[in-house]
Amino acid sequence: MNNSTDAVNPAKKPQTRREKREAAEAFLKNVSDQSFPNSKKVYVQGEIHDIKVGMREITLSDTLVSGSKDKPVYEKNEPLCVYDTSGFYTDENVEIDVHKGIPRLRETWIDARDDVETFTSTHSEFAQQRLDDEGVDEIRFEHLPKMRIAKKGKNVTQMHYARQGIITPEMEYIAIRENLKREEVKDATLLLQHKGQSFGASIPEQITPEFVRDEVARGRAIIPVNINHPECEPMIIGRNFLIKVNANIGNSAVTSSIEEEVEKLVWSTKWGADTVMDLSTGRNIHETREWIMRNSPVPIGTVPIYQALEKVNGVAEDLTWEIFRDTLIEQAEQGVDYFTIHAGVLLRYVPMTAKRVTGIVSRGGSIMAKWCLAHHKENFLYTHFEDICEILKQYDVSFSLGDGLRPGSVADANDEAQFAELHTLGELTKIAWKHDVQTIIEGPGHVPLHMIKENMEEQLEHCGEAPFYTLGPLTTDIAPGYDHITSGIGAANIGWYGCAMLCYVTPKEHLGLPNKEDVKEGLMTYKIAAHAGDLAKGHPGAQIRDNAMSKARFEFRWYDQFNIGLDPERARTYHDETLPQESGKVAHFCSMCGPKFCSMKISQEVREYAANLDKNAIKIQLLDETITLTSDEAIERAMQEKSAEFKATGSEIYQLAE
């Protein structure tokens, strides 16, 4: 709870695979110490259910309001609550051992509904093969939980409960979490907010459990919580809620150990990932995923076709429905919360991509396109879609209907193939809803700024307001190495228009696999984009954190400025590069302008000058006369004095600090 942050580690960054694995192991041994400076985990008690909802509370310093140097008078600033995706990793009262997994928050909720049964023998042939393989004993997660499946004839999805009029613990949890104790804020300055433009979204002033239930029942929001992922803290994806951000992790045939992937998971949740997609394509996918599931406080998504392809040695033509079905069951039993399934890549749409500049850029889309052409048959994900629904509703796995024909360049944006697939995804959504299976729709991609809004409008019209989930979109193709920025611009815009979740893009996009720092950079960019979208929509309470920052900035509360920000570590590091002394943390100026020409310092002096007046006027004794000024005149006089001071020191905007 102190204001200091650890110094930047000057040690050499790990380079070899062995060094990276050792660094990841060291990180995971200290995984319980992931808290932010001057922050603590707080819990809000439920009213309908016996639940405790975690969020992060930032303690702020007091504001100097009057008094003298010897006897200052301070005014307390109330603590600031912010959304927290880090789970128990930032609770100093909970000791985490990644070899055992994190606490199973939802286990009693799931069992209390009495519509699931447990089993110990997997229903997946491949999963059984892995369990029988002694060669992977060394890397296997040891503390495997019991698996759950719906009882015969039961549907265990949150959408099914919502349509029965049931408010589940998950729904109340989400309502409390989305509100962030906003009703307790007393400072009127913090509650200031501009009216937004919501483009038809229906965002209430206060999120209630009933509102959550209704949105899920309508299909306008999803709660991705597999019954086999009891460690997951409930969250919601929908345009009438806070915009969410997804981070991608995953090993490949040439990079990353299990330790590194778990480290990336914990790292991602610390920096604000609302969900994480495991896109692993290398060795030991099954074992890696088990470690991730047992240690994840956020929903985990996958693209099952990637693992199915591994099972046929990378030959797309050899894929079968039976192999894919077994993969779905394997992953559902492990607890995967949502599947990206490219069921909208139809045989007749593939020729539409022939004239594109970049063709089919989606890995899953290209796999299914190749299968369709090789067999000259319709996509088996499409023809077996209802079979997939039957599997998903037994575990409450949500659909993330993949955009396999998304544009891979701005030249291909909004073309015939992209929108043909989108319309098909809308048709499939209706089928999923018939089974009460929760569904979101994936979107592009590469789209120039002026064409983004059309994507949102097209999706809302054809997909029944199911939540939209987009990769960016990237607004230009000219900046490899900076595509977190090119896409962050598009993400902020489409979030404003109604997109419910944004998939981050890292600086390594199109260039290589991201490391830890790339993951953080991508997340920071997308947390900014999501927040900007919430502000633009006028989401209730979205501006509270901005107002707290502005107040701290104007009052030169430097530690509070660091701590209120999304990345306190970087804020402090950048500040200390110029003003490293402790005195720089209490100075009433910053390094930009120095003490003489700090705009906020000048504004404060003008305020103080005016505050010393009587309510209406002040008498000022000059050499040869006494004059009376009104408050407005006094402020004008103060401004004139500052003008003269500015000219006397050379009329330079920036001057060296003394």
Swiss-Prot record:
Its cofactor is [4Fe-4S] cluster. GO terms for molecular function: 4 iron, 4 sulfur cluster binding; carbon-carbon lyase activity; zinc ion binding. This is Phosphomethylpyrimidine synthase. Gene3D superfamilies: 6.10.250.620, Radical SAM ThiC family, central domain. Zn(2+) binds at H446, H510. It comes from Colwellia psychrerythraea (strain 34H / ATCC BAA-681). One of its GO terms (cellular component) is cytosol. Its EC number is 4.1.99.17. Homodimer. It catalyses: 5-amino-1-(5-phospho-beta-D-ribosyl)imidazole + S-adenosyl-L-methionine = 4-amino-2-methyl-5-(phosphooxymethyl)pyrimidine + CO + 5'-deoxyadenosine + formate + L-methionine + 3 H(+). Keywords: 4Fe-4S, Iron, Iron-sulfur, Lyase, Metal-binding, S-adenosyl-L-methionine, Thiamine biosynthesis, Zinc. The keyword Zinc applies.
